[in-house]
């Protein structure tokens, strides 16, 4: 079995951001030489996530508003009693989840017509990483 592990690095300019990363993942899959297998894409932080959905600006805004409604910024969270101020970021990351696994078929990501991979940042303006691990034959 072939494997390849690479890391994507992020430092967003805003507190919350949604970054389309399908092209970067495609490049890593191509570099791996894997024809049949899978790729794991995982945020290595507890205030960020990875998800698959449409790359449509209205939908991205809807996702952001929905998450903000469910876990508002600056609410009085118990987590803040520890001196932190990012309780909402942890909750938003739980809703998005931290990883996806995408099949590789004939050397390409086997995504649906409108499916794209995104990095979701909920506590930005600092260095963060995403691991991309390709496995297969």
Each model region followed by its residue ranges:
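Active-site histidine-anchored catalytic micro-motif
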Residues: 1-137
């Amino acid at each position: 079995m072939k494997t390849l592990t690479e890391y994507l690095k992020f430092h967003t300019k805003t507190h919350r951001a949604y970054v389309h990363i399908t092209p970067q993942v495609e490049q890593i899959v191509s570099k791996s030489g894997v024809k049949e297998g899978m790729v794991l894409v995982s945020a290595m932080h507890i205030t960020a996530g990875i998800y698959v959905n449409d790359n449509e600006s209205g939908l991205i805004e809807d996702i952001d508003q929905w998450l903000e409604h469910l876990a508002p910024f600056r609410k009085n969270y118990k987590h803040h009693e520890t001196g932190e101020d990012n309780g909402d970021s942890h909750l938003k990351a739980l809703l998005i989840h931290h990883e996806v696994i995408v099949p590789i078929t004939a050397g390409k990501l086997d995504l649906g017509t409108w499916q794209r991979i995104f990095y979701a940042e909920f506590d930005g303006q600092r260095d963060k990483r995403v691991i991309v691990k390709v496995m297969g034959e």
